[in-house]
Amino acid sequence: MATLREHSGWGPTTAVLVGAWLLTSPGTFGYGESAMAISDRVVGATAVIFGLLAISPRRAWAAWVVFAAGFWALFAPLLLWAAEPAAYLNSTAAGIVLIAMSVVVTRLVDRQAADQPAIPPGWSFNPSSFVQRAPIIALAWLSFLMARHMAGYQLGHSDSAWDPVFGEGTENILTSEVSKAFPVSDAGLGAAAYALEALIGYMGGAARWRTAPWVVALFGVLVVPVGIVSIVLIVLQPVAVGDWCTLCLASAAAMLAMVVLTLPEVVAMLLFLMQRRRQGHGLWQSFWRGGPMDDAAAEPRAARLSDPPSHVWRAMTQGVTLPWTLAASLALGVWLMLSPPMYRIEAVAGDAHFVIGALAITVAAIALAEVAQVVRWVNVALGLAMIAAVWLLPGADVAARLSATVAGALLAMVSLPRGRIRETYGQWERWIR
C-alpha cells in the first residue's frame, strides 16, 4: 500500500502544473480583467501551494484543499457567467484535472490493501468491477460533452445549438422561461454534474462496495435520485415548454442507462452496511472506512476491457435483463407519448398522455435492473391512472380515449408478472418480486 501511495505522488505534482497553467491563463487568453481571471488566479495559486504540500504523505489533507479548488473551478464559469469561451474551457478542464489528481488518483486504491473478496455473499457477480463501471463512465463523459455544447449556447459562446431532429427545438428550450428560472446555466450545471459522476466512477477498487461505501453512496446519489429527477424534467419538456430537444433526450437516455447499471452496486453497499450494523460495528465508521464482509467470495478472474467483445458485453450487463414484459411497457410508454399528435389530443388530456407515458418509460427502464424489478408495480398504477385520466379530462375524442384505455390496461397487465432473473443476489432476493 505504501508503494502504491508513493507512485500516486504524480497526482499532486500534476496539480501544481495545472495551477501554474491557470495562473498564467488570463493574460495569455485575453480575459485578464474579468471575474473569471480572479477566480483562475486564486485557484491556480491554491493548487500550486497545496499541491506541493500534498506531495508529502504526512500532509495528505492538503489534497482535499486542491480538491476544493478544483470543485470551485468546475462551477465558477456558471456562477460567474463566464463571457469568454477560453475562460469557460480553461476553468472547467482545470477543475476536472484538479479533482482527478487530488482525490481520484489517491482513491484508486482503497484503504484495504486487497480488493478480494470482491463478490458480495450470495451474489453471482461483482457489481464494483471496473468493467461494470466502464459504460457508466463512458455515458457520463458523453453526456458531459452534450451538456457542455448546450451550456456554450446559453453562456453566449456560440450563435446556435445543434439539433438535427427538431430544428430550433434545442434553442427554444435553452432560452425558455423554465431555463431562465435557474440562476445559472442549467445545461452547464448538468455538464458539471456529469463530470463529477464520471470522476467518481474511477474512484475505488474492485470491491469498493465494502471498502469505500461513501464513494458508492455519493456515486449513487448523483446518478440515481438526481438522475431520475433530471430524466423526468427532460421528458416533460413538451408539456412545460412545448418543444423537444435532441441532445436533451439523448442525455436522458444515457442517464437512464446509468441508473440501471448503478443500482446493483448501491444495493451491495447497503447490504454491507446492514450486515456491519447487525454485527455491532459502528455504522458511521463502516460508511467512511469500509471493512470485511462475512461470506464474501473472491472473484476468480475479473473481466477486462481487452477480453473478447462478447465477454466484455456480458460482464458489463450482468444484473440487467430485458424480459418481454418490460419491453412491452417501454413500447406502451412511447405509444402514449406519441398519441397526442397522432390523435390530435389537446388540452389537459394531451399533457396526461405525455406525463404518464414518460413516467412509464422511466419506471420500466429502471426495472431492467434485476435488483429493482419491484418498481415495475408503479406502472400498474400508471396504467390505471391513464384509463381514468383519458375519460375524466377534456381534450380527447372517442378514438383517442379507446386507444388510451387499451394502452393503459395493457401497461397494467404486463407490469404484473416478474421478469426472468439471471443472477443471484443473496439477501436482496426477497425484495425481487
Where are these regions (language model features)?
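A charge-rich, low-complexity, intrinsically flexible signal that marks solvent-exposed coils, linkers
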Residues: L52, L382, A389, G395-A396
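N-terminal signal-anchor module of multipass membrane proteins
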Residues: A2-R5, V18-A20, T24
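Active-site-proximal polar cores
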Residues: G426
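Central hydrophobic cores of alpha-helical transmembrane segments
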Residues: V66-A73, N379-M386
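Membrane-interfacial helix-loop segments of redox and metal-homeostasis proteins
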Residues: H7, T24-S39, T46-I49, R58-A60, ...
